[in-house]
Amino acid sequence: MLHHYGKKYYSLGSSILVTSSPEPYLLLASVAGAAFVVLVTTAASKHGTVVGGVLTALPLTGAWAVAIIGVTQGIGSATGAVGGYLLGAGVWFSFLLSYAILAKWGFWQALALAFLVWGVMTSVVFVSGVRDFLTCLAGGTALSIAILCVYFKRLKFEDYKGERRDVGWTKLVARFVGSFAILLVALGLSSVRGPFLGGLVSTAPIISSQIVYWTYIEQDIEFSRSVTKNIVLTGTILIIPYGASIWWFYQYFGRSFGTVYGIFFGTLCGYGIAAVGAYAAYRVATFLAEKQILASQSSP
């Protein structure tokens, strides 16, 4: 019964939403994205790399992009954008990993090469024709976990504390202006080239590049590299479950409630999986340590 109701609501909602004028929503989305950059960079500078990374990886900008695609183009387009959003998360993390590895040779060289990596991978994903939701989910998840393993097994960045100091209005305005186009570009591409590309670009590194730039300017290169680790960690925990949740909830509850339920259940599921994984890793590590102690005690 719920399924039938959802389809009826959906059909009606789509016919209404497609006729919505996109301009106010595009402007509002751009303002929200720029304000988000100001918030995150200020929090990272004051409270450290963990806070900055966690805030950056919250699925807020992607959720906003998918929701506004639903407003301007219909719910069907919004659900079509989720596949690109999921694969885009893995490609976005590739950008961050590339920057983190290359940054020790220079900030601007690393940033330029990281954008090149992101551009090539985005183009490959788009022209490959992969649109199936489960394929996008599996691909985005596998890529995200692989990149996370590189961070924790190979790079092993330390976390840094921030400095509680006032940030001048000039810097805040510069951050806002420099980040204004993030969702405007994504939504514009979705209307021209289809919602899948809009979802793919909604996780574009435009916001995170601003964040690593400002943390580099205000702190140093190691602080900036460390932020990327926490972005990938939080993003892997939250973005993939959120994307899967919103894809399902959109079909039954529409844009508004689908977004709310998707954020709630995606976050709950993500942190639940992370907690179970952390506990399992702790138990395995404890077992191996106890086994090693027993072996050393039994040896002559």
Language model features: what each stretch is:
Residues G76-Y85, F93-A138:
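Membrane-interface helix-loop-helix junctions at boundaries between adjacent transmembrane segments
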Residues A181-Q219, R225-S226:
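Transmembrane helical segments that form the transport core of multi-pass membrane transport proteins
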Residues S21-G33, L55-T56, I75-V91, L134-L143, ...:
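Structural signature of hydrophobic alpha-helical transmembrane segments
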Residues G139-S144, P205-I206, Y261-Y279:
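Small-residue-rich transmembrane alpha-helices that serve as helix-helix interface/gating elements
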Residues T56-T72, L238-G243:
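A generic, lipid-embedded transmembrane alpha helix
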Residues L27, R154-L197:
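Selected transmembrane alpha-helices and immediately adjacent juxtamembrane segments
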Residues I69, S123-V130, F180-S191, I239-R255:
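Hydrophobic alpha-helical transmembrane segments in multi-pass integral membrane proteins
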Residues V50-P59, W105-L116, L134-T141, E163-F176, ...:
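Cytoplasmic-side transmembrane-helix entry/capping segments in multi-pass membrane proteins
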